[in-house]
Amino acid sequence: MENEKLLGHRRDFLKAGALLTGGLLLDQFAFAAGHSGVDDTIKIALIGCGDRGTGAAFQALSTKSNLKLVAMADAFQDRMDKSHKLLSDKFKEKVDVPADRRFIGFDAYKKAIALADVVLLATPPGFRPMHFEEAVDKGKHVFMEKPVAVDAPGIRKVLAAAEVAKKKKLNVVVGLQRRYQTNYRETMKRIQDGAIGDIVGGQVYWNSGGVWVNPRQAQQTEMEYQMRNWYYFNWLCGDHIVEQHVHNIDIANWAKNAYPVSIQGTGSRAWRTGKDYGEIYDNHAVELTYADGAVIYSLCRHFEGTANRVDETFQGTKGRTYLSANNQGILWDRTGKEIFSHPTKGNANPYQTEHDELFAAISKGEYKFWDAERGAKSCLTAIMGRYATYSGQTIKWDEALNANNSLFPDKLAWDANPKVLPDAQGLYPIPTPGKTKVI
């Protein structure tokens, strides 16, 4: 995917966060810890040892902060073994995860979280709400990948935990890394300052050739198959409008400094139609309508052999803008004159920046990041898009937020069944607009 290649004492110290100065300093011991011989190593746990989780750990361990990876958790032994070897080979002095701290299974996350000061949450996103809730309950700082949930009940759980995290002064960074990318920050700062007036419209895109697929293996139970091939099942992924296109939808909300009041649109399965592709669509086209009447058009598709486009453009009352993950950020006035262009060379990797800034704040005893609420609301925006395309209905913000259609299985076990199952031919039921009920 072309625009996504950018790849005891301390716990007690961090828990002393009740003493605040201006809402910023976590505790009175932050300075002393660095000058008194106290072990100020920040212990981190990785929850989800796939490619993205391994990448997140790589970025965390690449920061200048004094970190050590002390625990890992995953559902699958092979993913754990691969991740542990890669990280151990690269960061010999920073990885201390013996076999008894490499936890396997559906409850492995609890054991790993208990041992850390900071947790990295990077499992398939269907598990994110329960993992985030556990981390916050145990008083841990958090980096969690997007999306933070795949359905409305999950969003509500994340929003509730986000409020607790604020009260506990726990730093939370969500992996919507464009928020940490210099061209986006510089361009958005100018937009918020009124450089192109009020945003009245826009277009956001993630059009690409699709992602990996893991075909069914003979020995797999249905639960294992769906978890191995998780991208194609909504309880795990949320469909690509949620799992991937949320990046661009988040930029729409950032540009508007608001969230849509309603969404309508259409989608289908046109290219990915076989049984290996589960239940999700391969294209979505939706309109995000905001309270002031502005409409932003959102398009995402996974079609092989078609033109790729992953970027955002917005129109204001005084001009327009173009942004992309390729470090572009351009503003024009209403006559077409360029008034700002961010240099595309020499920019930091935003995947690294989000970890650099998070761990710098934690190391200094600062409370600076509360991304969870914002991340949850942009994820809800994307979920609304899926609700709209699956049902063919106009979906309003409040009804989406309060929906009770949980996608999560009633039981987590290798011999338990998820809620969506294949027919005798191995094909899964596909949402049909006008018939499918989402709320």
Regions picked out by a protein language model, each given a short descriptive name:
Residues V118, P129-Y180, G194:
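Beta-strand-loop-alpha-helix segment that lines the small-molecule cofactor/substrate pocket
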Residues L7, G17, G55, E243, ...:
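C-terminal helical cap and adjacent loop that interface with cofactors, partners, or active-site loops
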Residues G48, R52-G53, K167-V174, R178-G278, ...:
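Predominantly a Rossmann-like dinucleotide-binding segment in NAD(P)-dependent oxidoreductases
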Residues K90-L121:
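A structured beta-alpha segment of the ubiquitous adenosine-cofactor-binding alpha/beta core
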Residues A16-K92, A252, K437-I439:
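N-terminal Rossmann-like dinucleotide-binding module
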Residues T123-G126:
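N-terminal glycine-rich "phosphate-gripper" loop used for MgATP/nucleotide binding
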Residues M1-T21:
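N-terminal secretory signal peptides and thylakoid transit peptides that target proteins
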